[in-house]
Amino acid sequence: MEKKYLRKHFALYLCLVILNLAFIWGNSFVPGEISGEISGGIFEVFSDLFAVFGDKGQFVLRKLAHFSEFTALGFFLTGLWRNISCREHVTAPLLLGLAAACIDETIQIFSPGRGSSLIDVWIDFSGVCLGFLLSRLLRHLLDRKAARKGPHT
C-alpha cells in the first residue's frame, strides 16, 4: 500500500513539475513585444495594486511573476524529490530549481526582443527557495498533525 501511495504522489509531482516548467519556459519563448503586451494586459487588471510603484509598476509585476512561478516550482520539486528519495534532501531540489532558472534565462537570449538577466536568475532562485521552505513547513505541520492522531488501526 505504501509503494502505491508513493507512486501516485510521485506521478502527481512529476506532472506538476513538467507543467510548471512548460509554462515557465513556454513564456520565455514568447517574443519580447508579445510578452510586453501580455504583461501590460495583466497590469491593467491589477493596476490599482501596483499604483504605489508608479511607473515601475509593470516592472514589479513581471518580477513578481518570475518569483511566483519559481516558488511553485520549488514547492513541486521538493515534493517530487521527497518521493524519489527516502531522505529529505536540501541540495537536489534547490540545484534543480537553480538549473531551471539558468535554462529559463538562456532561452530568453534566443527569443526575439528578449534578453537574459542575472537579476532574474536570483529572483527565480529566491522563489525556488521559498517554495522549498513552504513545502518543508507544510510537511512538518502534516507530520505533527499525524503524530498527534497516533497510528491508524
Where are these regions (language model features)?
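Alpha-helical transmembrane segments of integral membrane proteins
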Residues: 8-16, 88-96, 119, 123
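Short helix-capping/hinge motifs at transmembrane helix termini and TM-loop junctions
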Residues: 30-31, 82, 112, 139
